[in-house]
UniProtKB/Swiss-Prot annotation:
Protein name, entry field: Small ribosomal subunit protein uS10
InterPro entries the UniProt entry points to: Ribosomal_uS10, Ribosomal_uS10_CS, Ribosomal_uS10_dom, Ribosomal_uS10_dom_sf
Domain of life of the organism encoding this protein: Bacteria
Function (record text): Involved in the binding of tRNA to the ribosomes.
Leader sequence residues: none
Family: Belongs to the universal ribosomal protein uS10 family.
GO cellular component, as recorded: ribonucleoprotein complex; ribosome
Keyword line: Ribonucleoprotein, Ribosomal protein
Subunit: Part of the 30S ribosomal subunit.
GO annotation terms (biological process): translation
PROSITE patterns, sorted: RIBOSOMAL_S10 (PS00361)
Pfam families: Ribosomal_S10
This protein's record includes keyword Chloroplast: no
Amino acid sequence: MQSQKIRIRLKAFDHRLIDASTQEIVDTAKRTGAQVRGPIPLPTRKERYTVLISPHVNKDARDQYEIRTHKRVLDIVEPTEKTVDALMKLDLAAGVEVQISLG
């Protein structure tokens, strides 16, 4: 496994949650002897929604809502068998989406 690279992409709505999960992954990988690049913050996606709060006319009465999707990328350059086993057993927070790819 010395020539492979593991890329981990994380997505979450709460930046504190994604930062804690990223730090937990980095600590686990470094503890098992792997080299880590990142975390690299990717652009935050902001989705805005405008809702009319008036039941009939009055177009000036509106509420605006926004949801932000925070993203991070980690590269584990030299994964060992211990690194892969430790990452598989790692229990992350419920609000974080994890996507793992080998390359």
